[in-house]
Regions:
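Amphipathic alpha-helical segments within extended alpha-helical solenoids and repeat-rich scaffolds
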Residues: 476-487, 519-534, 579-594
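Buried hydrophobic core positions in alpha-solenoid tandem helical repeats
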Residues: 408-422, 444-446, 475-480, 517-522, ...
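Flavin (FAD/FMN)-binding glycine-rich loop and adjacent Rossmann-like elements that form
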Residues: 3-14, 19, 63, 140-141, ...
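Glycine-rich Rossmann-fold phosphate-binding loop(s) that bind the pyrophosphate
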Residues: 32-35
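Structural detector for internal amphipathic alpha-helices that build alpha-solenoid repeat scaffolds
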Residues: 405-407, 424-439, 443, 447-450, ...
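Short, hydrophobic/aromatic-rich segments at coil-to-beta transitions
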Residues: 131-137
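Conserved N-terminal/central alpha/beta ligand/cofactor-binding core
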Residues: 2-9, 15-25, 43, 49-50, ...
């Protein structure tokens, strides 16, 4: 039975239709020709498939070109994309001043050489299905509506536009308030010698809300990047840097719980490598497990290796369509790692090889044997076991600004080794090792909890807490009441203060007695007069942000989330906590204790989230 699935006002409608006369019939239709889509189309055409590319914008490359994100952030090397990158560098030296423009031109050349048909300024407005197998598309173009038939469709729209129309299930945003990562706008600049790019992070935006997106675009284009910069601004890039959108529910996902439990897929298509790169500083409102890692153990900037399953790009219960882009099937925590340019280039190759095997063998995507795909990916270097490097410390520079070699993290397995690490300013690995070791670590940690050494005892308190023991609660309360301002030094960015970490763990443990102190932190106007907020050398952000009280924000955001967690566990405390939220946030005056920046700025957006999240939970109670 043939269906046409369409979306109207955010709702899906599927109706039975006759098989249409397709205006264009191809082996592969690629929707969205950005970082992943342009390469998926090119690699597939090189493999011998007939390919149609459909793009809403007016050039190829997406974020990698029109978005101004020219370079790589970590990732793994190897694969067919490296030849393209090498050509781009040569093209740039000969013809353009930047790699973004060179990549646009080179990709256009490759498309023409490989006879890839391209529809620019085109939008998908319907999906044809034979039961749950995608067989074609309805596309709105400048020339009118075209009916496209394809043996396989790839949704590379970044926001799962096509699969959403088809009726596939997807997720979006963080659990606390549905918001996504902050967006950026990239600027082309000139420092008197070289051309380059810089970016400004803004607030969060729901790109599926046309009014909100328009407001975000206008605001971003009104801001000039001035803080800490000495260069001439030449241009703004045409598209916003949206870091997050929908994520499909796939046949096999990659998740943070699996990663931390050392459970890896048996069928990877490549290995992703980066930190859980959450932009913004309100990580208090992310998942508890991410909080354990990034706040409770202070390891947020450690790099992780994610084995990405090949079926993470196959929507659950659907056939004939792949999603090789940012919308692939990973959980939200992992998505902040598996989204970098190298990842998108590798997933493009994996999808092109998978589609090629299916078309040439005359089978469905599910019928393609993984070993055949694996052989292709290993041959090109896209998939290498040497890329499976676990957890590492990377991106560290010395005083001369030289990049130091990355080092592998070796977790502690002998409890007697805890003290040596806990007494340092870098106890994070010991704290997480305790979680991995389990109750076997507890006797040693309880002994260290009574150490006369301040670092040892306080860091042991975090390690005891990660094992869900309440034995360290009195010391955690003491750290909060002191507003312990010691900043750990495990990471190259986003290190935490002990006072904030103590608040986090008291919330995770559901401590009733700390509630009055936390309410005082969020309600007392004189809180900002404490010494911890006056120290100029304390900085929890990646860079100094003028007119933003970042340390105060960390204490308040952790307190809000801790109160929510305690309220979820203790119904009798909910009225007291709810009153605290009302006293803290009902008046707009609270906003100006943090910043005077616009509500659409990154900082303003985070401050507004304090109120929104607090009231959302209180209203549910």
């Amino acid at each position: 039975m043939i269906y046409l699935s369409e979306t109207r006002d955010g709702k899906n409608f599927r109706r039975e239709v006759s098989l249409p006369h397709f205006d264009i019939q191809v082996d592969l239709a690629v929707c969205g020709l950005g970082t992943a889509g342009s390469l998926a189309a090119f690699f597939s055409a090189e493999n011998g498939l007939s390919v149609l590319g459909i793009e809403a914008f007016t050039c190829l490359g997406g974020t990698h070109t029109a978005g101004g994100v020219a370079y790589h952030y970590f990732g793994t090397k190897g694969g067919r994309y490296e030849a393209i990158d090498t050509e781009v560098k040569g093209f740039s030296k000969r013809y353009t001043c930047t790699e973004t423009e060179a990549r646009k031109l080179l990709l256009e050349q490759k498309f023409r050489e490989n006879k890839i048909k391209t529809l620019y300024r085109a939008s998908i407005c319907g999906v044809y299905l034979d039961e749950n197998k995608v067989i074609g598309l309805r596309v709105l173009t400048e020339q009118g509506i075209l009916e496209i038939g394809a043996k396989i469709v790839m949704d590379c729209t970044a926001d799962a536009r096509v699969v959403t129309i088809a009726g596939c299930k997807a997720e979006c945003g963080r659990d606390t308030d549905g918001q996504m990562q902050p967006y950026s706008l990239v600027y082309m600049v000139y420092d008197g010698k070289n051309y380059g790019f810089t970016n400004v992070d803004f607030g969060r935006v729901n790109q599926f809300d046309r009014k909100a997106l328009s407001e975000a675009i206008l605001y971003a284009r009104s801001v000039r990047p001035t803080e800490g910069h000495d260069f001439e601004l030449l241009a703004q890039t045409p598209i916003l840097g949206l870091r997050e959108g929908r994520r499909i529910i796939p046949e096999e996902p990659a998740t943070l719980p699996d990663l931390f439990a050392d459970r890896q897929t048996a069928t990877p298509m490549f290995y992703s490598y980066a930190d859980l790169d959450k932009h913004g500083w309100d990580i208090a409102f992310d998942s508890e497990l991410l909080g354990d890692w990034a706040i409770g153990a202070n390891l947020g900037a450690y790099n992780l290796t994610v084995a990405v399953p090949y079926k993470a790009i196959l929507p659950k219960d659907f056939e004939g369509i792949l999603v090789p882009c940012r919308a692939l099937g990973v959980d939200r925590d992992i998505s902040s790692c598996v989204r970098m340019n190298p990842d998108m280039k590798k997933v493009a190759e994996a999808a092109s090889e998978w589609a090629t095997l299916a078309v040439k063998q005359g089978v469905t995507l599910r019928e393609v044997k993984y070993d055949h795909l694996k052989e292709k990916l290993q041959k090109s270097g896209c998939l290498k076991e040497s890329d499976n490097r676990g957890c590492r410390i990377d991106g560290i520079r010395n005083k001369q600004n030289d990049m130091l070699p990355s080092t592998e993290v070796v977790w502690i397995t002998n409890p007697e080794k805890f003290e040596d690490r806990l007494k340092t300013e870098q106890p994070g690995e010991a704290i997480w090792s305790a979680k991995r070791m389990g109750d076997h670590a507890l006797p040693t940690l309880l002994r260290l909890l009574n150490s006369e050494d301040r670092n040892t005892s306080r860091h042991a308190a975090f390690a005891v807490s990660i094992l869900k023991s309440r034995k360290a609660v009195p010391l955690l309360r003491q750290m909060v009441k002191e507003r312990d301002d010691f900043m750990l030094k495990d990471c190259r960015k986003h290190n935490n203060l002990r006072g904030c970490m103590a608040i986090f763990w008291l919330g995770r443990l559901g401590d009733r007695e700390i509630v009055p102190e936390l309410i005082d932190i969020i309600t007392n106007p004189k809180e900002t007069e404490r010494g911890v907020y006056k120290q100029k050398d304390l900085q929890t952000t990646r860079y100094r942000v003028n007119d933003f009280e970042d340390v105060y924000f960390q204490f308040v955001s952790e307190s809000v989330m801790a109160l929510i967690r305690i309220g979820e566990l203790c119904e009798d405390l909910r009225p007291q906590i709810k009153k605290g939220f009302i006293d803290a946030f009902s008046s707009g005056e609270y906003y100006h204790r943090f910043t005077s920046r616009d509500r659409l700025s990154s900082e303003g957006n985070m401050v507004l989230a304090l109120k929104n999240i607090a009231f959302n939970f209180a209203d549910k109670w």
